[in-house]
Curated annotation (Swiss-Prot):
It comes from the Bacteria. PANTHER family: DNA REPAIR PROTEIN RECO (PTHR33991:SF1). Gene3D superfamilies: Nucleic acid-binding proteins, Recombination protein O, C-terminal domain. This is DNA repair protein RecO. NCBIfam families: reco. One of its GO terms (biological process) is DNA recombination. Belongs to the RecO family. GO terms for cellular component: bacterial nucleoid. Involved in DNA repair and RecF pathway recombination. Pfam families: RecO_C, RecO_N.
Amino acid sequence: MEWEDEAYVLSARSHGETGAIVELLTEARGKVAAHVAGAASRRMKPFLQPGARVIVRYRAKVEGQLGSATLEPMGEGPSSLFDDRLALAGLSAAAAVAAAALPEREAHPGAFHALEALIRVLEIPEIWPAVYVRYEAGLLQELGFGLDLSKCAATGAFDDLVYVSPRTGRAVSREAGKPYHDKLLPLPPFMLSSQGGLAEGDVKAGLDITGHFLEQFVFGPLNRPLPPARLWLLDRLAEADKL
């Protein structure tokens, strides 16, 4: 079996003296792992970083078994962010969450395009943390656990939605949620609309929502915690006063 496609690198771990097992996210085939020979070379290391975009030429004797691949870089990749540690933390977290959450060899084009959209804005510090939250919400949607923020779960009202039920992932209005506000998750306005700016605490609230449902529906059933890179991102955003 052979194919060629564009992909984002999600992770790379050493295998043997000079090779690596590389996890890749493609649009048509989803998450795919492959052995890449010569990955330890100085030439290849820069485009084996999380978020690097590459052309993959993949070959396997039997479908479903670990194949081998050659990679060709597309553009400068994450190297453009090397002076921005916070953006690199966001990129590392996005790749780690996708690598841990997505099943192997199952197409999830929405996840591919969500990662693509995030990478495009990582050089804009004012907006990328909010886009990161939407990225995780998009992963939940792709995996069948999408949030329903269209109307109040209790009343059907479309206005003044300020909470999310931690049980169902559905929005709750201010009035309906008032008696239970200490048990509900605050819903930041930017998750309802791309219009308007970010208030203090909005990104933290958004990450709390997506993190809660990733733990509840994706990682919890697998007895896994959120990836360390995701937890590290929260710490780095707090240090930079971006929450």
